[in-house]
Amino acid sequence: MKKFLTTAPVFSAIWFTLTAGIMIEFNRFYPDLLFHPL
């Protein structure tokens, strides 16, 4: 449990950074798809 408490915040921080980076890159190449959904 101690190992989980130390790895969970690190993993979530990396995950949110990757997700934000993907969203920013997707928004840069396809700006209309993100704000005007089907």
Swiss-Prot record:
- What task does this protein carry out? May help in the organization of the PsaE and PsaF subunits.
List the Pfam families hit by this protein, alphabetically.
PSI_PsaJ
* Membrane topology of this protein: Single-pass membrane protein
UniProt-annotated location(s): Plastid, Organellar chromatophore thylakoid membrane
The primary location reported for this protein is plastid
By sequence similarity, the record places it as follows: Belongs to the PsaJ family.
Q: Would the keyword Thylakoid turn up in this protein's UniProt record?
A: yes
Q: List the NCBIfam families.
A: PRK02733.1
**Mind listing the UniProt keywords for this protein, alphabetically?**
Membrane, Organellar chromatophore, Photosynthesis, Photosystem I, Plastid, Thylakoid, Transmembrane, Transmembrane helix
**Membrane spanning residue stretches:** 4-24
| GO cellular component annotations of the record | organellar chromatophore thylakoid membrane; photosystem I; plastid
**This protein is called what?**
Photosystem I reaction center subunit IX
A biological process from GO: photosynthesis
Q: Does the keyword Secreted apply?
A: no
Q: List the disulfide bonds.
A: none
